[in-house]
Every structure is written in structure tokens, then in C-alpha cells.
């Protein structure tokens, strides 16, 4: 009876190699040229760099939106001078409004 128990323990200790394949493209056999051209597919992602990139792009988009909003506000205002020589800022009005 010792032989069946030893066979079951051997089966538990050495699982088939198919279960331990590396997931994704790292386990696929590819050429060196493909790996050189597409290194981002085989390198482990660097999360701090990804977070830095997302924050940087978000800040750039926010800054461009801010510049667009302030430029639009500047276009609608102009400095007017009345008959007495006083200067004041007026909002542009259209003849069609």
C-alpha cells in the first residue's frame, strides 16, 4: 500500500510543465527583431512611470484648456474711451445681437 501513496505524492509535487507557461507575449517564441522593435510588449510595466505620465498629460491638457479659456475672455473685452477721456473696459457686442 505504500506504493500508491508514493505515486500520489509524486504527482502532487511535480505538476505538468504546461501549467507554468509565462502569460502574455513573454511566453511566445518570437524573433529578436520583433522584440527589438516592440520592447514595450515584453518589458514589465513600470507603474510609477505610468502614473507620472498620466499626471503630466493631464496637467498639459488642463493648461491648454486654461490658456484657451483666458484667451477667449480677452477677445470679448476691450478698452473703451468715452467723450470725457475716461477709460473703461467693455464687453464687445455684436450688431447682430
UniProtKB/Swiss-Prot annotation:
Topology term for the membrane: Single-pass membrane protein
Any one Gene Ontology cellular component term annotated for this protein: membrane
Key words of the record: Membrane, Transmembrane, Transmembrane helix
Record carries keyword Chaperone: no
Pfam family, one: DUF4500
Disordered, as annotated region: 1-26
Protein's UniProt keywords contain Secreted: no
Transmembrane segments: 49-69
Chain intervals with Low complexity compositional bias: 1-14
InterPro entries, per the entry: UPF0708
Subcellular location: Membrane
Stretches of the chain forming a coiled coil according to its record: none
Family membership: Belongs to the SMIM8 family.
Protein name: Small integral membrane protein 8
Naturally occurring in which organism (per UniProt): Xenopus tropicalis (Western clawed frog)
Amino acid at each position: 500500500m505504500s506504493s500508491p501513496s508514493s505515486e500520489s505524492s509524486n504527482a502532487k509535487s511535480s505538476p505538468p510543465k504546461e501549467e507554468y507557461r509565462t502569460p502574455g507575449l513573454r511566453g511566445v517564441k518570437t524573433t529578436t527583431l520583433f522584440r527589438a522593435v516592440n520592447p514595450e510588449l515584453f518589458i514589465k510595466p513600470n507603474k510609477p512611470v505610468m502614473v507620472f505620465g498620466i499626471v503630466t498629460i493631464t496637467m498639459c491638457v488642463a493648461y491648454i484648456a486654461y490658456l484657451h479659456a483666458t484667451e477667449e475672455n480677452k477677445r470679448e473685452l476691450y478698452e473703451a474711451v468715452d467723450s470725457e477721456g475716461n477709460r473703461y473696459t467693455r464687453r464687445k457686442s455684436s450688431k447682430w445681437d
